[in-house]
A protein has these predicted regions:
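Alpha/beta-hydrolase fold catalytic core
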Residues: 1-40, 62-65, 131, 173, ...
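Active-site loop/oxyanion-hole signature of alpha/beta-hydrolase fold enzymes
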Residues: 9-10, 20-21, 62, 68-110, ...
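Conserved HGGG/HGGXW glycine-rich cap/lid loop of the alpha/beta-hydrolase fold
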Residues: 24-80
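Flexible "cap/lid" loop of the alpha/beta hydrolase fold
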Residues: 120-125, 129-161
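Conserved alpha/beta-hydrolase catalytic His-Asp/Glu region
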Residues: 144-146, 161-217
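Conserved serine/cysteine hydrolase catalytic core
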Residues: 196, 200-243, 252
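Catalytic histidine neighborhood in serine/cysteine hydrolases
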Residues: 244-258
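Catalytic histidine-centered segment of alpha/beta-hydrolase-like enzymes
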Residues: 256-269
Length: 280
């Protein structure tokens, strides 16, 4: 679970709803002082939310980019159905296309972890809205065996327990890491996340096929693979190989693990804006 440094957005960002042809999505919309030189659409990972990108928003706007971080359907402040079918990857990818359409300008697409696999699916449906694609800590196929087991344990618990009961069980087994975030914010996010969404997307993470060759064939589209120097969800050598197969730029953020966006935000933002500036 990503732990943002705060749930309070910086002054450059406004919390609002993005209205699309597929419904309303809660977003943090950060804008630079002048005319943006580009717009970025940010997709969070499994159990995450738009707040996972909070520490990147100010550096992005300072570099001249508008950034729109979104809660996907069933994530935190975006409502979603109670049926697992509503969270099929094709549905979530279609949501991304609708979000890009509503933003109204071509976007640099970035997905973290699960968000990267949804971003990939969106590009494979229709690459036309996207200027570039960044996959952050998001691998070529299913997650590692250890993570598959963790996802199964969580999904089994969600079938028989309430979200509050699961939260308390997780905290008992895995106390929160030291963080400036008030644990109440993390709990509030968890309780507002759809259990159906977690079960459906968790399953996707455990069975996702390797679609790297399909993605590599999408040209011209600059691609960027970003990760920390350690990752137990998709091992770093696997991400290295994926980047090579994609012909993508590769960035390893020193001192970061599965969430460079929260572990080392300044270094991560610098690598991203350099890529978007044209340093492909």
């Amino acid at each position: 679970m990503s732990r943002p440094p705060t749930f309070t957005p910086p002054s450059c960002a406004r919390a609002r709803f993005l209205s699309t042809r597929r419904g309303r999505f809660a977003v943090l919309d950060a804008r630079p002082a002048g005319e943006p030189q580009g717009t970025v659409l940010l997709l969070p990972g499994f159990t995450g939310s738009k707040e996972d990108f909070i520490a990147l928003l100010e550096p992005f706007t300072e570099a001249g980019y508008r950034a729109v971080a979104v809660d996907g359907r069933g994530q935190f402040e975006t409502e979603g159905p109670d049926t697992q079918e509503a969270y099929a990857q094709s549905e979530l990818a279609s949501d991304v296309l609708a979000q890009a359409e509503a933003i109204g300008t071509p976007v640099h697409l970035l997905g973290h972890s699960l968000g990267g696999q949804i971003a990939r699916a969106a590009v494979l449906l229709d690459r036309s809205p996207f200027v570039s694609l960044t996959l952050m800590s998001s691998g070529p196929a299913q997650v590692s065996p250890v993570q598959r087991e963790r996802v199964k344990l969580l999904s089994d618990a969600l079938v028989t327990m309430t979200m509050e009961q699961v939260w308390q069980a997780m905290r008992a087994m895995d106390p929160p890491e030291e963080t400036p975030v008030d644990g109440a914010d993390l709990q509030r996010r968890w309780l507002r996340t759809s259990a159906a969404q977690l079960i459906a997307t968790g399953r996707q993470l455990t069975v996702e096929p390797d679609r790297v060759a399909e993605l590599a064939a999408v040209q011209p589209l600059p691609k960027h693979v970003v990760s920390g120097e350690q990752d137990d969800t998709w091992p770093v050598p696997l991400l290295d190989a994926m980047a090579e197969r994609l012909g993508a730029r590769r960035t390893v953020v020193g001192g970061a693990q599965h969430s460079p966006n929260t572990d080392r935000p300044q270094e991560t933002a610098t690598a991203l804006t350099d890529f978007w500036d044209g340093g492909h």
